C-alpha cells in the first residue's frame, strides 16, 4: 500500500460520523397529547374520589349551642308523635264501694273514656268498626278454704249489633282451694288474680262487659288491681 493511500485512510477515519436525523415532528406532538390526556384523566379521577369520600367539598354548617341538623323525615316523625291520637280508648276501674257487685267507673283517677267510647249500663260501647285490644284484670282474696269447692270465674263478653247475641270472648276459671281448711288450724289468706286480653274485630255499637261470678271475693285493698279497657289498633 502506498504512503498516500495510508494518509487518505487516516484522514477519513478522523472525520466525524454524520448525525442521525431526528424523528418527525408529528411523533413528538402525539406524545405530548398522550401525556396531557393521561394527566387530565388522572386528575379528574382523583378529584372525583376526594369528593365521593368527603375529603373535600361543602362542610356541614355548625349550629350554635350544640344543636344538630334534623332531616325532614325526622321532623315529620317528631311532629306526628306529638299529635294527639284520635283512636277510641277506654280504661275503667272497679268501684270499691259497690258491695256484692262489680261496678265499673270512668270518673276516677287513672280512668278514662276517649274518642267516642261510652260506659253505659256497666258496658263499654264501641264507637267505630275496627280491631280492638280488649283487656281486664280482677283480684280475688279469701281467708281459708270452706267445705264447698270455690271456683272463681272472670269473663269478657260481647253483645254484637249484627246478631244480637251475647258471646263470651275471653274467659278463665281458677280454684284457690285444693282442700278444706281443717278445724282448729289457722285460716291463711289466699290471693288469685285473673288477667284476660285479646285482639278482636268489633263493630260500631257493640257492647262489651267484664263480669265475675263471686264479687264478694274481690280485693279492693289497693287501686289498680281491678280494671277493664279497650284500645283501638
UniProtKB/Swiss-Prot annotation:
Lineage: Eukaryota, Metazoa, Chordata, Craniata, Vertebrata
Residues the UniProt record annotates as site (Cleavage): 34-35, 39-40, 49-52, 76-77
Name the record gives this protein: Tumor necrosis factor
Organism whose genome encodes this protein: Canis lupus familiaris
Membrane topology (Extracellular): 57-233
Residue stretches of biased makeup (Basic and acidic residues): 1-11
Family as reported in the entry's similarity comment: Belongs to the tumor necrosis factor family.
InterPro entries tied to this protein: TNF (IPR006053), TNF_alpha (IPR002959), TNF_CS (IPR021184), TNF_dom (IPR006052), Tumour_necrosis_fac-like_dom (IPR008983)
Region (Disordered) residue spans: 1-25
Record-annotated membrane-spanning stretches: 36-56
Single GO BP term: positive regulation of calcineurin-NFAT signaling cascade
GO CC terms, sorted: external side of plasma membrane; extracellular space; membrane raft; phagocytic cup; recycling endosome
Cytoplasmic side: 1-35
SMART domains, sorted: TNF
